[in-house]
UniProtKB/Swiss-Prot annotation:
GO biological process, one term: translation
Gene: rpsK
Pfam family, one: Ribosomal_S11
GO molecular function terms listed in the Swiss-Prot or TrEMBL record: rRNA binding; structural constituent of ribosome
Keywords: Ribonucleoprotein, Ribosomal protein, RNA-binding, rRNA-binding
Summary of the function given for this chain in its UniProt record: Located on the platform of the 30S subunit, it bridges several disparate RNA helices of the 16S rRNA. Forms part of the Shine-Dalgarno cleft in the 70S ribosome.
GO cellular component, one term: ribonucleoprotein complex
Protein name: Small ribosomal subunit protein uS11
SUPFAM superfamilies on file: Translational machinery components
Length: 130
């Protein structure tokens, strides 16, 4: 009988990327943290849902902190040291995610709010009556 063929999965190579950009998208329901190099290629990402939170707990500041720590840990393994932070959205996890990145050991050089604001574009959805 023939010997079984060994399957080798794709192994991610350890890149040395000292500078990067952290994109934090914080909505009322979830927080997504993507860490890219300066040209925009994603190095690591995490979200409150990927960190194990479900339902309404994904929108909490603690879930955003956990997601930011997980993404920062993987970026530090790739050799990242300095980051620029771009924050988008009105969610409750904005500040805690930034604080978690700082505590993880990444040096923040810039924080910019890039939340899209309409110049009277589409009509807003009607107000909820609860």
């Amino acid at each position: 009988m023939a010997a079984p063929v060994k399957k080798t999965g794709s192994k991610k190579s350890k890149k040395n990327v000292p500078n990067g950009v952290v994109h934090i998208q914080s909505t009322f329901n979830n927080t997504i943290v993507s860490i890219t190099d300066t040209s925009g290629h994603v190095i690591s990402w995490s979200s409150a849902g990927a960190s194990g939170f479900k339902g309404a707990r994904k929108g909490t500041p603690f879930a955003a902190q956990t997601a930011a720590e997980a993404a920062a840990k993987r970026a530090l393994d790739q050799g990242m040291r300095q980051i620029k932070v771009l924050v988008r959205g009105p969610g409750s996890g904005r500040e805690t995610a930034i604080r978690a990145l700082q505590v993880a050991g990444l040096e923040i050089t810039l924080i910019r709010d890039v939340t899209p604001l309409p110049h009277n574009g589409c009509r807003r959805p009607k107000r909820r009556r609860v």
